[in-house]
């Protein structure tokens, strides 16, 4: 399907500049790699190229209609969109002020700028001198993580999934950067005055009890290698039940040793033997 046909289905066919830009991005994708390797079909690739072009030209783009047209789920579409952008080397420029206006959190602008400055300084200080020159803080995931943590600090609601979508990253990368930023800039974005262990926080303790083997570093969550308290209690209860049953059986055998030690022998079964058949010969 041609780019112009997809643009017509998304009501974007009137913008000739957008169609030309999307076609240019599609040719760049075809020249650099085979999109089928990352599971992106031709129609989905054309839709994603249109969205990338619309983003760069600051044109309003209906992502819901695009996801429906691509034939993929929203999560799979976002993953393919991010992969395609990274492969062709197109970087999203994320401005703190535009982000604050978009999410309605204008009062966090100054805080976000301070957190980004402190994080960069402290992160570079933790690196060896040979690696400091290669550190890249221009990626939008750092701005998005600082914005989210500052909004959370000031108890402002921000749609996390939408923010991840805007900055063009994955949930795992966003969570990793948020955790690193919280550790290095806890005085700026920390919720409490001091860090607490996961077992001391009721909400986190309940989460660890439910999923002892599948813990994620999400909002307020912490990972731990120890077994949860609920699992330990359950294990102790099972052991106690087993010990009670074992003591009951042992006491029963002590009271009736003959009954307990007597072996049960299966009676032999004697089936009647079949009568031997004799062949009858007829005299001719």
UniProtKB/Swiss-Prot annotation:
Keywords: DNA replication, DNA-binding, Nucleus. Follow a cell-cycle regulation with a peak at the G1/S-phase. Mostly expressed in siliques, flowers, flower buds and mature leaves, and, to a lower exent, in roots, leaves and stems. One of its GO terms (biological process) is pollen development. The gene is ORC6. Induction: Regulated by E2F. Accumulates rapidly after cell cycle reactivation by sucrose addition following cell cycle arrest mediated by sucrose deprivation. PANTHER family: ORIGIN RECOGNITION COMPLEX SUBUNIT 6. This is Origin of replication complex subunit 6. It is found in: Nucleus. Component of the origin recognition complex (ORC) that binds origins of replication. DNA-binding is ATP-dependent. The specific DNA sequences that define origins of replication have not been identified yet. ORC is required to assemble the pre-replication complex necessary to initiate DNA replication. Belongs to the ORC6 family. Pfam families: ORC6, ORC6_2nd. It comes from the Eukaryota. Disulfide bonds: none annotated. Component of the origin recognition complex (ORC) composed of at least ORC1 (ORC1A or ORC1B), ORC2, ORC3, ORC4, ORC5 and ORC6. ORC is regulated in a cell-cycle and development dependent manner. It is sequentially assembled at the exit from anaphase of mitosis and disassembled as cells enter S phase. Interacts directly with ORC2, ORC3, ORC4 and ORC5. One of its GO terms (molecular function) is DNA binding. One of its GO terms (cellular component) is origin recognition complex. It comes from Arabidopsis thaliana. The keyword Methyltransferase does not apply.
């Amino acid at each position: 399907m041609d780019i112009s046909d997809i643009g017509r289905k998304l009501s974007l066919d009137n913008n000739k500049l957008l169609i030309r830009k999307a076609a240019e991005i599609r040719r760049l994708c075809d020249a650099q790699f085979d999109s089928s390797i990352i599971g992106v079909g031709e129609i989905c690739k054309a839709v994603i190229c249109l969205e990338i072009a619309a983003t760069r030209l600051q044109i309003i783009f209906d992502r819901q209609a695009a996801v429906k047209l691509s034939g993929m789920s929203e999560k799979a579409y976002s993953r393919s969109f991010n992969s395609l952008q990274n492969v062709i080397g197109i970087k999203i420029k994320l401005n703190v002020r535009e982000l604050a206006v978009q999410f309605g959190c204008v009062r966090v602008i100054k805080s976000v700028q301070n957190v980004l400055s402190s994080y960069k300084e402290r992160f570079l200080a933790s690196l060896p001198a040979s690696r400091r020159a290669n550190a890249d803080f221009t990626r939008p995931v750092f701005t998005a993580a600082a914005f989210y943590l500052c909004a959370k600090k000031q108890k402002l609601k921000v749609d996390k999934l939408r923010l991840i979508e805007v900055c063009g990253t994955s949930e795992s990368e966003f969570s990793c950067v948020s955790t690193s930023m919280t550790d290095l800039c806890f005085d700026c974005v920390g919720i409490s005055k001091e860090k607490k262990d996961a077992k001391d926080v009721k909400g986190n303790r309940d989460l660890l009890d439910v999923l002892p083997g599948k813990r994620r570093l999400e909002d307020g969550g912490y990972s731990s290698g120890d077994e949860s308290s609920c699992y330990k209690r359950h294990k102790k209860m099972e052991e106690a039940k087993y010990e009670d049953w074992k003591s009951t059986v042992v006491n029963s055998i002590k009271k009736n040793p003959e009954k307990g030690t007597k072996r049960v022998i299966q009676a032999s079964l004697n089936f009647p033997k079949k009568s031997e058949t004799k062949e009858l010969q007829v005299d001719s």
